Amino acid sequence: MAHEELPILELRNLCKTYELKGHRTVDALKAVHLELYPGECLGIVGESGSGKSTLARCVTHLERVTSGQIRYRQQDITRLNGKALRQQRKQIQMVFQEPSAIFNPRMKIGAFIREPLINYKIMKGQQAEQEVLRLLGRVGLSATTADKYPHELSGGEQQRAVIARAIGVEPDIILFDEATSALDVSIQQQILELLVELRKETGISSIFISHDLAVVQQVSDRIAVMYQGEVVEVVESSQLTSSANHPYTRSLMASVLSVREMKHKVQAQKQEAEQEQEQEQEKVEVLQESLSG
């Protein structure tokens, strides 16, 4: 798909090398080139160790790249530091896999969401308090959540609170790094639906990172497939089955199909067992009626 707009984020030949003991090195990222366009959701999929989380940490400046460029709105932000970096982090937010690791256990949820609003001088006082309640409602949490501590929330509720904090500063880009993988399937689906809704409403660009191809395909416009630190293929989500050419992408697709087939088989067996149970119950009821008569 051709894009008429300029990319909001561009990674040019991004490399990240880790130095290990014994003068050994590991190339976590190898000349990665990717573009993210305004309003787009770019999925990044790959197995553990493929480099996808390293990529997210480099984009958000939690890690320094070894070489290459990170360009935001056509400006090189690769080596930002100090106040400039702090301001840049407002524009590129990140939602991690484990929300519990982000919270201060002694800070209530309301204060947690309000904190960046105050720190970035977006609003203050009563206005910030009202904004917290609005954000909670937007992610499907009640107003009473503001007075709760992190340990009083479920994993899904914690992730919703983290998302509320991230969208509160009105960033241009949000990175979701395995943001639903620690949740059970039903809660995961609710969070994915929330992300789709928020994207439609706000127009925020996003990068959704996961090892699960089916999940990535559900929320993304395009999918970048990473393998051993490289982007081996970028395909349109809607054309994945017909356009994917790389053997690794094909293997991911095959594993997704096998998992789906297994789920369908388990579901069919469950339904069959329930039907048999109902039939047995009906027989018991008929027998009881005949005996009582």
Predicted ranges, named:
Residues 2-7, 25, 234-276, 280-293:
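Short catalytic/signature loops enriched in Gly
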Residues 21-23, 77-93, 119, 239-244:
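ABC ATPase NBD coupling module
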Residues 60:
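Helix-to-loop junction immediately C-terminal to a conserved catalytic motif
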Residues 68-76:
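Conserved ABC transporter NBD signature motif
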Residues 76, 127-144, 253-254:
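Conserved ABC ATPase "signature" region
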Residues 149-153, 157:
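Conserved ABC ATPase signature
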